[in-house]
Amino acid sequence: MDKQTIINKIQKLIRLRDGARAVGSEGEANAAAAAIQRLITEYNMSLSEIEGTPEAEEESCIGRSNNYHTADNYRSGWKRHLLYAICEYYYCKAYMLSGTPRCVVYGTEMNRMAVEYAFNFLEAAFTHLSVIRFKEAHGTCRIPTRHRDVWLASYLLGCSSGIREKLMSEKTEQVTGLMISHGAMIDKYMAQEQGS
């Protein structure tokens, strides 16, 4: 496919995603967003190429996100593992703030937005599912709180590990090259930030 055909296809998917969100079809919006991400990654494109606007060029610069609270009630570190996996998939880097349960994310504006959306969505979904799965597994049995917490921590850690495996299995050699490029830009930004 030539570049313009790919750009047209991505623009149609963006309109589909926005339309699905407007009518409240979260599943269709997520499917369209995943297809957009896959095409952008596969063909090594940037948002500025798709939108063709100077504003999009400005969005591609590296920046730092707000703090992500990664502490969890079970001290298993599942939120941190989830954030790291999502960051790696979206060409960002996450770092723990010393002495706190918080992380910051470095990357392009669009990638950081994707990380924030995916992290918030998956964190809420996994937390909700963990309670449902616990009730399915144990029914009406009385389980000590400590055992329940261990079970939930194990389930949530398994969810974050499963997401990591799924995201990493979708990578190709082209994606690896793009990751190295973004990694170098992030390292350069961090060096400049520390130097000033």
Predicted regions and their residues:
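Short coil/turn segments at helix-helix junctions and helix-capping linkers
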Residues: V23-G27
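Non-transmembrane amphipathic alpha-helical segments
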Residues: I6, I10-A20, L39, L129
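Extended, helix-rich structural scaffolds rather than catalytic motifs
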Residues: M1-N8, M45-S196
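Short amphipathic alpha-helical coiled-coil/interface segments
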Residues: I10, A29-Y43, Y155-S160
